[in-house]
């Protein structure tokens, strides 16, 4: 199966996680989803314009490849993880080095393949927990500083990407987490979010100089 732009646009979530080629997953995500800023208009006066900034370095966290979720990686540096996934860290390696990781995070592999649709608000609902008052659900979102949630229902599952504000930016948000069948979202309020455009994040040559 070839993972390309048409695949991302039309993917319905119907795939066995064990059959996903993780190198191809990372490559197609880098090419068509990450390293972009996504621009939206909303019906909320507090946030008339919303920007989501999604970088390559967010990918490992969304896959559950962190110290908290996978116990036996040789590195937890996001850039190194991405490079290893494109080379020799195939799915069998990740499973054999921590069997519990796959059991707990396999649906996130599917969720990452749905990120194109989530970020383009394609057949999605957009929610906010900002108006939840005095509830356990509200406290969880407040703790994680989640402002917005984009939800895609498909193949009898709900995939949600949670968005938190970028430091020192009022209307720019970054992916906080990717969740599946999170019941907390049903306490959230639905809002209208319209995708306007996306722009490739240009590589900063000055900051990147000297990096290997």
What do these predicted ranges mean?
Residues 206-212:
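Non-transmembrane domains of secretory- and envelope-associated proteins
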């Amino acid at each position: 199966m070839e993972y390309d732009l048409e695949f991302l646009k039309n993917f319905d979530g119907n795939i066995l996680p064990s059959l996903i080629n993780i190198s191809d997953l990372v490559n197609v995500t880098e090419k068509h989803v990450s390293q972009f800023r996504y621009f939206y208009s909303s019906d909320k006066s507090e946030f008339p314009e919303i920007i989501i900034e999604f970088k390559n370095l967010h990918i490992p966290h969304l896959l559950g490849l962190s110290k908290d979720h996978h116990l036996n990686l040789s590195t937890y540096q996001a850039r190194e993880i991405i490079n290893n996934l494109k080379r020799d860290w195939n799915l069998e390696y990740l499973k054999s080095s921590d069997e519990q990781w796959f059991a707990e995070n396999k649906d996130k592999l599917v969720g990452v393949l749905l990120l194109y649709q989530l970020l383009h608000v394609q057949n999605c609902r957009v929610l906010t927990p900002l108006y939840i008052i005095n509830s356990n659900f509200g406290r969880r979102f407040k703790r994680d500083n989640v402002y917005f949630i984009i939800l895609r229902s498909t193949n009898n599952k709900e995939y949600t990407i949670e968005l938190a504000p970028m430091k020192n930016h009022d209307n720019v948000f970054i992916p906080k987490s990717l969740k599946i069948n999170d019941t907390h979202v049903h306490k959230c309020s639905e809002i209208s979010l319209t995708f306007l455009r996306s722009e490739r994040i240009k590589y900063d040559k000055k900051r990147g100089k000297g990096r290997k």
